[in-house]
Amino acid sequence: MENTKPNVLILCTGNSCRSHMAEGILRHVAGDLFDVNSAGSNPAGYVHPLAIQVMKEIGIDISRHTSKHMKEFLGGNITTVITVCGNADQACPMFPGQVNRYHWGFEDPAHAKGTDEEMLNTFRQVRDRMKLVFEAYAAGSREFATTHGKHPNNAA
């Protein structure tokens, strides 16, 4: 049985909202199964305050996350890359190498318009959709590990 946890990298363009929310959720529900990080192809240099706020509402603290470039992870031991870019007009980053790849598109809440409450609700909606997707991913991975005695991403 493989003792090393698979390394999951969650990518989007700016690494300011979606990828951090996804990283926080996946760490929260499956930190025992995966080492989780996030990065972007064109990092914004900050984590959006509304992303921090809506994650705190569900008991997940991402306030110490930092915006990172995907280059920091090249040549590393990444086993799975999950892209979370949502719009067809976005240049979703491609991570080179032999990795498991998933794309789960989510609207970018950083582009939300309206009142403060409307913008906050957009962040909450994206967070709640991400929570469902990443909880399901974690549950499937946990079931596989229990049944097969190894992580699915280490099942080569």
Task: Show the residue positions of the predicted features.
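Conserved acidic residues
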Residues: 79
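Short glycine-rich anion-binding loops that position phosphate/pyrophosphate groups of nucleotides
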Residues: 16, 86-89
